[in-house]
């Protein structure tokens, strides 16, 4: 469903002489050597980013055609890896011979939003057209060290008209926004907690979110579609995702706000008056542990991209642009 990333290829000619020059310069001036952990540098070379996207596409096509989750794990991580990995695992259980009718994913008309960053992990965004539909895909690639391969951690799907206007610095690089201490209405690192509080309590949980299908609409769907009956009761639980395993990332927009990618976790438990629970979805059955005598609980991960306004933008609220929720496991009791 998504694309994958290659190991960057770095030129090695004249490495020794360049290192020697850098050492002499630092000895004379007292500066520090420019490493990813010490200085503000581009997250990825402009020639390496396309190679990462190409590698991603190659591996994800192989993984999806063979239905091999171990291949998928080589190029995906975070929310995207959790959702796609579980999906491929389930489809493999139901189709162990693979997917011979799979149509390869291809990317085109790509631009790369590369921030300059200090320290690790590093990340960048590919904004690309794809062979699946007419929408734009935003893929966030990340890695924890120079020795690691780039892996995609987020996918967001936007109509061309939804793409915001990104800010750039004096050198043309995208401008990253930290997870805290910003001038935004909601700090990027707090979005998961604020959003899940809203889902549980409405405006009592948070008043930061604009009405829409993934906010007021989702709460209304839970109240109506899953209203309790004499035969079945449905319960929901929502919580922010681990900020290390599912790190949020954000880019500054020209209007002073930010585009933020973040992750949440969700549970839906259905308990029946008289069991056993009949599960008709083969993918749920493939991921099920335990015996659903009276109840089944679905565990899901959701990846979201939102526009967060500046705190000074009076009356503005957080707006959802895309949300992808996927089943990662299920249990019966």
Report residues per predicted region.
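Core segments of small alpha/beta cavity-forming domains
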Residues: 40-92, 167-236
């Amino acid at each position: 469903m998504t694309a994958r990333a290659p190991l960057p290829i770095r030129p090695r000619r004249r490495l020794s002489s360049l290192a020697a020059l850098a050492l002499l310069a630092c000895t004379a001036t007292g500066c520090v050597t420019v490493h990813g952990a010490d200085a503000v540098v581009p997250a990825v070379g402009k020639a390496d980013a396309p190679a990462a996207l190409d590698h991603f596409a190659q591996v994800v096509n192989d993984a999806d055609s063979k239905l091999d989750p171990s291949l998928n794990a080589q190029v995906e991580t975070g929310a995207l890896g959790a959702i796609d990995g579980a999906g491929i695992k389930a489809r493999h259980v139901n189709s162990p011979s693979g997917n011979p009718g799979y149509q390869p994913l291809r990317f085109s008309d790509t631009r790369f939003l590369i921030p300059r960053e200090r320290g690790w992990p590093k990340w960048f965004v590919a904004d690309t057209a794809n062979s699946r539909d007419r929408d734009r895909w935003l893929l966030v690639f990340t890695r924890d060290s120079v020795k690691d391969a780039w892996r995609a951690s987020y996918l967001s799907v936007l109509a061309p008209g939804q793409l915001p206007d990104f800010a750039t610095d004096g050198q043309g690089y995208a401008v990253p926004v930290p997870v805290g201490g910003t001038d935004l209405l909601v700090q990027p690192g707090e979005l998961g907690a604020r959003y899940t509080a809203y889902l549980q309590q409405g405006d009592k949980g948070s008043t930061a979110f604009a009405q829409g299908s993934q906010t007021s609409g989702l709460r209304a769907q839970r109240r109506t579609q899953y209203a309790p009956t004499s035969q079945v009761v449905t319960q929901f639980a929502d919580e922010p995702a681990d900020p290390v395993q599912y790190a949020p990332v954000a880019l500054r927009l020209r209007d002073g706000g930010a585009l933020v990618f973040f992750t949440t976790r969700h549970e839906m438990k259905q308990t029946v008056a008289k069991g056993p629970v009949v599960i008709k979805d083969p993918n749920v059955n493939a991921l099920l542990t335990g015996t659903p005598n009276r109840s089944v609980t679905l565990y899901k991960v959701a990846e979201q991209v939102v526009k967060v306004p500046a705190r000074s933008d009076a009356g503005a609220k957080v707006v959802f642009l895309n949300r992808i929720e996927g089943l990662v496991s299920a249990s019966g009791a």
